[in-house]
Amino acid sequence: MVKAMEQEQETYKSRLFHFKNMNENSASRHVKSWSSDCAMRMDGSDNLDDDDNDMMMFRSQPGKCGSVDRPSLPIGGVTPNRNDKLPRVSSSDSMEALIILQAAMEQMKEKFSKLLLGEDMSGGGKGVSSALALSNAITNLAASAFGEQRRLEPMAVDRKTRWRREIGWLISVADYIVEFAPTQQTNKDGTSMEVMSTRQRTDLLCNIPALKKLDAMLLDCLDKFKDQDEFYYVKKDSPDSCETRNDEKWWLPAVKVPPNGLSEISRRFLQSQKECVNQVLKAAMAINAQVLSEMEIPESYLESLPKNGRASLGDVIYRMITVEMFDADQFLIEMDLSSEHKILDLKNRIEASIVIWKRKMVQKDTKSPWGSTVSIEKREQFEERAETILLLLKQGFPGISQSSLDISKIQFNRDVGLAILESYSRVLESLAHTVMSRIEDVLYADQLTQEPTNNAPSKNRYSLKENEKLREERLSFTEDMASGTLSDVMQWGNKNNEMKKESFFGDREKPLLSKVTGIMTNNKKSSYLDNLGAMRSPTARYS
C-alpha cells in the first residue's frame, strides 16, 4: 500500500514538473506581448479607457487560463504559483509614473493652447503674434525658474526639472522650421541627380545646439557649488550681515567667509568659474546681438525718429562724437552714468543716431536741394564711433534693460525662429550675469577679509589698481589735448573747448567705466528677470 502511494506521488511530481515548464514558457510569451502592447498604448494614445484596457488584456493573454487542464492533486500536494513568474501590470510605481505623464501632457496642452491663442483667452483673435507669444513664454519661464537664484548654490531639483522640460517644449518648435536645400540623390541604376530636400533652417541649426550647450554649462557651474563649505549666507536682517553688507544689493543675503578668508584652492576655483561664466555671457550676448541685427526695424520706430542724428544725440553728445580726436573710453568717462535711467537714455540716443545715419547713407539724402552738409565718409566714421560706444555700453552693463529699438523689434517681429533665438539667448545672458554677480559677491567678501581698512569707503568690488590705471589714462589724454596743434584747437572751437575743460576737470569723481556694475541696482527691489516675468509684452520702462 505504501509502495503504491509512493509511485503515485512520483507520477504527480513528474506531471507537475511538466506543467510548470509549460507555464514558464507561456508566461514569457505573455510578458513579451504585454510589453509590446503597453509600448503601443503609451505611444499611440493619451488616455486609457476601460475598453482599451480590456482589449490590451485580451491581446496580452490570447489563451484563457481555464483552458489548461489542471491535474487533480492529492491532499498535501503543492499548487504551482503563477504569480511568481508573471509581472504585475497595475503596480504602484507604474500608476504613479502614468499619473505624472498625464499631468505633464495636460500642462503641455495648456501651454501650447495659450501660445496658439496669442495670450488672448477670449479667442477673439486680438492676441499677439505667435512669435511674440513664444518669446514671452520663454521669458516668463526663465523668470519663474531663475528669479529666486539669490545664492551661489545649485538650483532646486523641481525648478531645474521644470526648466529643462518646458524649455524643451518651447524650443521644439524650431525643429519644424525648415528650408529647401539641394542634395544629391543616387538612383537604382547608379545615376545621381540633384533634388531639393528640406532641412532645419541654417541659423537655427547652428545656434540652437550652441544655446543648449551654454544652458548646460551654466547649470553645471551652479551644481559645482553643491558640497562647498567655505562660505555661507546669512539673512539680510541678521546682525552678522552688517560686516559684509553691500548697500547696492541690500535685498540679497550677505556672504560670510572664514575670518582668514577663503583658501587658495577655493579662490582659484571661483576665479576659474567666473572666467567660464564670462565666456558664456559673451557668447550669449553675441548670439543675441546677431539675432537682433537680423530683425527688421518696424515702421513705427522709424516714424518716431528725428530728422538727423544731431537732434537725436543733442548738441553736447554730437560734438563729442564728431571731433577729430575721439576716444570711446574717454567719452564714457565724460558722460554721466550714475543711474540706469541715464545709461538707458544714452543707449537709446546712440541707437537712434546709428539708424538715422545708416538710412541717410542708403538714401543719399536726396530730399535736400543743396545736398547734405555731411559727407558719406563722415557719416560712416560717425556711425562706427557710435557703434563702438554702444558695444562698450553693452559690455559694461550686461544687465541693463532693453533699449527702445530692441523692444520695438521684438514686439513687431513675425519670425518665430528669430523669436526663439532672441528670447533664449537673452534669458541665458541674464542668468550668466546673475551667476557672475553671485561669484563676485563671494570674492568681494573674501577681499574684505584681506583688506579690512578699505571696508568702509569701498562700495565697488574693483581693485584700486584699475582705478589708478584709468586715472593715468585720463591724465595722459589731458596732456595730449594740451599739446595739440593749432589746427586741432581750431577744430574744437573756443566755446566748445571751454565747455569740455569745465566738464572734464570740474568733476574728478565721476563714475568710471570700471565702476559701472554697481550703479544698476541702486533703486531696484527686484532682479531684471523678475521685471521681465511680469510683462505681458516687451514695453519701454521709461516713457
UniProtKB/Swiss-Prot annotation:
Among InterPro entries, the record links this protein to: PRONE_dom, RopGEF
Specify where the region named Disordered lies, as residue ranges.
61-89
Predominant place of localization: cytoplasm
Q: Which GO terms describe its molecular function?
A: guanyl-nucleotide exchange factor activity
What's in the keyword line of the UniProt record?
Cytoplasm, Guanine-nucleotide releasing factor
Found, by tissue, as follows: Highly expressed in elongating regions of roots and pollen grains. Expressed in flowers, and at lower levels in leaves and stems.
Pfam families assigned to the protein according to its UniProt record, in alphabetical order: PRONE
Cell inner membrane listed as a keyword: no
Answer whether the UniProt record assigns the keyword Transmembrane helix to this protein: no
- Signal sequence bounds: none
Segments forming domain PRONE = 95-456
Q: Could you tell me the Gene Ontology terms of the biological process aspect for this record?
A: root development; root hair cell development
Domain of life of the source: Eukaryota
Q: List the subcellular locations.
A: Cytoplasm
Which GO CC annotations does the UniProt entry carry? cytoplasm; nucleus
Show the PROSITE patterns listed in the entry.
PRONE
What the protein does comes down to:
Guanine-nucleotide exchange factor (GEF) that acts as an activator of Rop (Rho of plants) GTPases by promoting the exchange of GDP for GTP. Functions as a light-signaling switch that functions in root growth and development through the activation of Rop in a phytochrome-dependent manner. May act as a negative regulator of phytochrome-mediated primary root development.
Q: Tell me, how does this one assemble? A: Interacts with ARAC4/ROP2, ARAC3/ROP, ARAC9/ROP8, PHYA and PHYB.
* Free-text note on domains in this protein's UniProt record: The PRONE (plant-specific Rop nucleotide exchanger) domain is responsible for the GEF activity.
| Note in the entry | Plants overexpressing ROPGEF11 show retarded root elongation and irregular root hair formation.
Protein name, please?
Rop guanine nucleotide exchange factor 11
Lineage, opening ranks: Eukaryota, Viridiplantae, Streptophyta, Embryophyta, Tracheophyta
